[in-house]
């Protein structure tokens, strides 16, 4: 099979998959359309195509995915890291906030924890998750990337956390009951526990905000990723709990997606 045969299918996910299989940029694929694929790579790409035809997520089909400037193992043990989340990682890394100690609640694959630890060598990062499967994936990624300034523990939110932090960051489950029942088919391959945020999608925001100040140092910051229509409600919860200097950030599509708030 030639590379051109894949290009002719006009399937963007398949092009991305081929770039991962070949470990080459997408430009290489189009500049080398007449090259033959090896038997091994032909089998790999056809296997991936079959999975994509069943609405299986591309990232799971590949088993790996780039996030910020690290490459993660990705599988059904945890939520697929979204490129939008890189916005808040980048913001935090470049901020002048105190960030000696960082807590990531709902660490999942470890994408946020590991990218922060990798880029903030002097910081200590703790990732917590209630799901053993997700923790095993996060630890696999830590081992793969050889990052020493991050640890992962099992904890239901703050249950097993016994210290204070400069930063608490979380991308919690925030899909509400009605929206969950009408999701894209691909999303049902991801763990429900990483997507479903209760009847109104705000369960975890309420729970985290209620206790966050107890685990934040003075001038510490609480950072959330939110659903596109949740800004006002989460802002109200933060204000009610005496958080101040609230900042709202948008994603690449112009939707309200992140909230940063300082401990009051």
Annotate each language-model stretch with its function.
Residues 228-241:
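Short alpha-helix
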Residues 239-264:
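Core SAM-dependent methyltransferase catalytic element
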Residues 20-93:
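Conserved AdoMet
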Residues 87-181, 186, 207:
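Conserved SAM/SAH cofactor-binding pocket of Class I
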Residues 142, 212, 238:
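Conserved hydrophobic residues forming the short capping helix/wall of the S-adenosyl-L-methionine
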């Amino acid at each position: 099979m030639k590379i051109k045969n894949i290009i002719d299918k006009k399937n963007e996910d398949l092009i991305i998959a081929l770039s991962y299989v070949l470990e080459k940029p997408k430009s290489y694929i189009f500049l080398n359309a007449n090259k033959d694929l090896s038997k091994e790579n032909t089998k790999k790409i056809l296997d991936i195509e079959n999975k994509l035809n069943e609405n299986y997520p591309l990232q799971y089909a590949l088993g790996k995915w780039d996030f910020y400037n690290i490459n993660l193992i990705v599988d059904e043990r945890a939520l697929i890291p979204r490129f939008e989340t890189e916005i808040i990682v980048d913001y935090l890394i470049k901020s002048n906030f105190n960030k000696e100690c960082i807590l990531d609640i709902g660490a999942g694959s470890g994408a946020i924890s590991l990218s922060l630890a990798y880029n903030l060598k002097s910081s200590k990062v703790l990732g917590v998750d209630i799901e053993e499967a997700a923790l095993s994936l996060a630890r696999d990624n830590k081992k793969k990337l050889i990052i020493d300034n991050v640890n992962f523990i099992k904890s239901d939110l703050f249950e097993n956390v016994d210290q204070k932090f400069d930063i608490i960051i979380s991308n919690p489950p925030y899909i509400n009951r009605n929206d969950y029942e009408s999701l894209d088919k691909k999303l049902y391959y991801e763990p429900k526990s990483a997507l479903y945020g209760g009847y109104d999608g705000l369960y975890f925001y309420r729970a985290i905000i209620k206790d966050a100040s107890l685990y934040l140092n003075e001038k510490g910051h609480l950072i959330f990723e939110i659903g596109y229509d949740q800004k006002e409600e989460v802002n109200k919860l933060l204000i009610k709990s005496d958080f101040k200097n609230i900042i709202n950030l948008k994603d690449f599509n112009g939707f309200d997606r992140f909230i940063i708030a300082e401990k009051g």
